[in-house]
Amino acid sequence: MKLTCVMIVTVLFLTAWTFVTADDSTYGLKNLLPNGRHEMMNPEAPKLNKKDECSAPGAFCLIRPGLCCSEFCFFACF
């Protein structure tokens, strides 16, 4: 019984976390396929887009650590 409750709470937490961290929580999961198709057509697209969207050193990065220009995050970009 306890394990079932823990599993239900965990699934609810992870579902909420997915929508909280999405760029646009109302359509966060809807826009995944068009981006994937664009990246399949041009494999270099994610690398090119990352340069424009990366955070400067000192910016807060705990929620989305992949956006640091230096790719090193410990509460802030280094």
Swiss-Prot record:
Keywords: Cleavage on pair of basic residues, Disulfide bond, Hydroxylation, Ion channel impairing toxin, Knottin, Neurotoxin, Presynaptic neurotoxin, Secreted, Signal, Toxin, Voltage-gated sodium channel impairing toxin. Residues 23-49 form a propeptide. Disulfide bonds join C54-C69, C61-C73, C68-C77. It comes from the Eukaryota. It is found in: Secreted. Residues 1-22 form the signal peptide. Expressed by the venom duct. The modification 4-hydroxyproline is found at P57, P65. GO terms for molecular function: sodium channel inhibitor activity; toxin activity. The keyword Ubl conjugation does not apply. It holds the Pfam family Conotoxin. GO terms for cellular component: extracellular region; host cell presynaptic membrane. The keyword Signal applies. The presence of a 'disulfide through disulfide knot' structurally defines this protein as a knottin. The cysteine framework is VI/VII (C-C-CC-C-C). Delta-conotoxins bind to site 6 of voltage-gated sodium channels (Nav) and inhibit the inactivation process. Belongs to the conotoxin O1 superfamily. This is Delta-conotoxin BuVIA. It comes from Conus bullatus (Bubble cone).
